[in-house]
Amino acid sequence: MLKTYHIALACVILAVVVLLFGGESLSLEEWQEVCLNVKNHFLHNEELSSLSVIILEIRLPRVILALLVGASLSGSGVVMQTILRNPLVDPFLLGISSGAMLGVAMAIAVVESNIAILAFFGAILPSLAVLAMNRVLGNSVLSLVLSGVVLSAFLSALAGAIKFFVIPQKAQAIVVWLLGSLSLSSYKDCLIAFIGLSLGFIPLFLLRWRINLLSLSDAQSLSLGINPVLLRSLCLVCVSVASALAVSVSGTIGWIGLVIPHVARLFFGANLQKLLLSSLLMGAFFLLLADVVAKTITPYDLPVGIATSVLGAPFFLWLLFRTRGV
């Protein structure tokens, strides 16, 4: 039977393999030189060699960022599906992806800097707007979902208009970000994603047994001493922060928040006591694997969002047939 530590071990093994063999593989002698050079760099301030720079400044931050972003998106997806009692929602329902895309489009078209900052605010503000709209409309799950769909469509239209009017070079930059990419990863990006993961999921871990009760009706949750409206709003804020910070450094990477929670439920059931951690780890593994595929299937460094769609869409279709007994 699959255990959580099996997934964690798989993440570690895949990360090591990517570091060793990602791009061009290094010989044993070259690895010995890299290890010695890195040790001397930290102990004796020796200058890093070109191979050491490739490992430490290119491969390692990309691996770390893939793990962090994948965990944030998949964990956000499983929480969203639980609290909204809908297996077809993902973190981008709240307008996070379309809002981030609008922020990036404005950054590229107007200021040409601070892309991550505008992407974050573009992602977080629609989420707060959806929560405010839902409060006005009666705090129902249906109004929350519909508010998110409407706002996402509106923001996507605005971003599309900006992309239409800018020069082709800037439009191409917007499209590349829209498809999601880890090619320009840095340790600063890793820190941002880690902060989002920590701020979002430490509260969710502490409250996961209460969040389980949101899978029941609001009336049943109230009878068990849970305020469903308050708890659902808190969960959505946590999910929004984690997803917004992840999207701000990686672009919009689809399917992870939708597919991975379903895969995790096949092995761990619907109880968040085990499901939440397993979803985080599975999402981390999946995005790192997708990034490997994106780098190897063509001579070019494809946006990782293309790889997640290629891997995720057929697998999700298989899940649908499997659950219906087809």
Curated annotation (Swiss-Prot):
Transmembrane stretches, start-end: 7-27, 64-84, 91-111, 113-133, 142-162, 164-184, 187-207, 241-261, 275-295, 301-321
UniProt keywords, alphabetically: Cell inner membrane, Cell membrane, Ion transport, Iron, Iron transport, Membrane, Transmembrane, Transmembrane helix, Transport
Example GO biological process: siderophore-dependent iron import into cell
InterPro entries named among the record's database cross-references: ABC_BtuC-like, ABC_transptr_permease_BtuC
Gene3D superfamilies associated with the record: ABC transporter involved in vitamin B12 uptake, BtuC
Location(s) in or outside the cell: Cell inner membrane
Iron-sulfur recorded as keyword: no
One function term, GO molecular function aspect: transmembrane transporter activity
KW rRNA-binding (keyword) present: no
SUPFAM superfamilies in the record: ABC transporter involved in vitamin B12 uptake, BtuC
Membrane topology per record: Multi-pass membrane protein
Domain of life per record: Bacteria
A cellular component term, taken from the record's GO annotations: plasma membrane
Described function: Part of a binding-protein-dependent transport system for an iron chelatin; probably responsible for the translocation of the substrate across the membrane.
PANTHER family, sorted: FERRIC ENTEROBACTIN TRANSPORT SYSTEM PERMEASE PROTEIN, MOLYBDATE IMPORT SYSTEM PERMEASE PROTEIN MOLB
Family listed: Belongs to the binding-protein-dependent transport system permease family. FecCD subfamily.
Protein name stated in the entry: Probable iron chelatin transport system permease protein jhp_0822
Organism annotation: Helicobacter pylori (strain J99 / ATCC 700824)
